[in-house]
């Protein structure tokens, strides 16, 4: 596993790990004291700077809840390249993402800056074939037929 430190708005490093070169890389927002607005700004920047972002409990290689695991499995099955944030690493991000989306639960999936939903919505869209079509409509490459 290769880790690369990249500066983040709040001055801390952004930890980037490549899980599989063609599938995903993950980032973890490091724990630092930050104001609510700073947290929201960092979340907004991450959501807008990446095509597909998953805020989850744990990491794609080690999900810490069943709901996060389901969304990771769906994204991996579709072969979608995505960025993930482990909200368990930073309480401010964990609470900030709920305020940002006005959605009370985690995981949360964003595509091209748009909030898609959590586990139930992603699973439902995947099972109906709508998720694959949604990614294609947004210009996100999908490798597998669903």
Name these PLM-found stretches:
Residues 44-78:
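Local sequence-structure signature of Cys/Sec-based thiol-disulfide redox active-site neighborhoods
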Residues 1-2, 6-33:
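Short, Lys/Arg-enriched N-terminal segments with co-localized hydrophobic residues
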Residues 29-44:
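Flexible, polar/low-complexity N-terminal or interdomain linker segments that lie immediately upstream
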